[in-house]
Amino acid sequence: MDVESKISLILRYPTEEVITVEELRELLQLGHQLNHYIGFEISGFIHIGTGIVSMSKVVDLQRAGVRTQILLADIHSWLNNKLGGDLDTIRKVAVTYYIEAFKKVIETLGGDPDATRFVLGSDLYHHNDEYWLLLMDITRHLTLSQVRHSLTILGRKMGESIPLAYLVYPPLQVADVFALGAHIPHGGVDQRRAHILARQVADKIRFYPLEVGGKRVKPVALHHKLLPALNISTKPSNKEELSEMKMSKSVPQSAIFIHDSPEEIRQKISKAYCPPRETEYNPVLELLHISAFREERKTPFIIKRPPQYGGDIEVWTYEEVERLYREGKIHPADLKNATAEALINILEPIYKYFQGPGAKLLQEMKNITITR
């Protein structure tokens, strides 16, 4: 695969931005093995924003010849008091439910689960003096203002009452980029600030310098779209506000989980925010895009409509759907029905896995979340 084809794969939906495309091109042109990483907190059930959206980019990167890595961020999760702040439980969930779920999603999306390296954060840090020297080195080159700016909206609003752990978190994220040798750190657009910090210190750190062919380089940040919560009631005014209105594990009706049954998916989508003719920040359209139009279609996609309203519509591209919806030629109810069936189809192998071989993992997770 030539460089431009690799770039097209990396840039395609659901990619939101790459910082910068030209630097990515330069790295690919050098012809050396590039490494990627994406990190996840260990908390509740995996929803499709974490599962389908994130893993679709992992699969794209695999196809582009990039070595992919998933960091199971147990220490970060503990700092953020996930799963009740029980570190043993966090670690158990990470190496069981999370790894197996991600592997199944990667396989379902056409990738190779064995080609992705899974790293538990505490394993990366254990008996690793150089990691802690790296972390201290990073803090030498960051100001309190920079770290505060990298926090979530909520964290920035807390002022002087903010837990110190929240301020430790961004430097840890930056250190992970270099400790994993990640030329392409990846996350949702809500991770942009942390990745910018990594780029700012890349030329200054002494430990774990990021190199390609002996040349020191800055990490090229890859950010994918965030799925709006199904139950939003208004359109977010900007991307940062969207990060506070994204699908959330802690609000079940805001999200579709990778193990949800067809009935649950239909029910959730039927109640989703989907204003007529509105195509921006429309969660139903975003779900249809990721489930039915990420790959070039070999057959038309059918949106069923009652005969009295013109009958079924055949479309080949997402752009067609968006245009027809904006023009009012697709009713929200018909869009929701078509989206639900498309999502049920793509999630079917994952749903069957959690009904069969993965049923024990799912039940263990349910037991854990009930007691937290």
Curated annotation (Swiss-Prot):
Catalytic activity: tRNA(Tyr) + L-tyrosine + ATP = L-tyrosyl-tRNA(Tyr) + AMP + diphosphate + H(+)
InterPro entries in the cross-refs: aa-tRNA-synth_Ic (IPR002305), Rossmann-like_a/b/a_fold (IPR014729), Tyr-tRNA-ligase_4 (IPR023678), Tyr-tRNA-ligase_arc/euk-type (IPR023617), Tyr-tRNA_synthase (IPR050489)
Protein name in the entry: Tyrosine--tRNA ligase 1
Motif mapping: 'KMSKS' region: 246-250
Binding annotation for ATP: K249
Keyword Nucleotide-binding: yes
Subcellular location: Cytoplasm
GO MF annotations in UniProt: ATP binding; tyrosine-tRNA ligase activity
Keyword Transcription regulation annotated: no
Subunit structure: Homodimer.
SUPFAM superfamilies in UniProt: Nucleotidylyl transferase (SSF52374)
Transmembrane regions: none
Record organism: Pyrobaculum aerophilum (strain ATCC 51768 / DSM 7523 / JCM 9630 / CIP 104966 / NBRC 100827 / IM2)
Source lineage: Archaea, Thermoproteota, Thermoprotei, Thermoproteales, Thermoproteaceae
Enzyme Commission code: 6.1.1.1
Originating gene: tyrS1
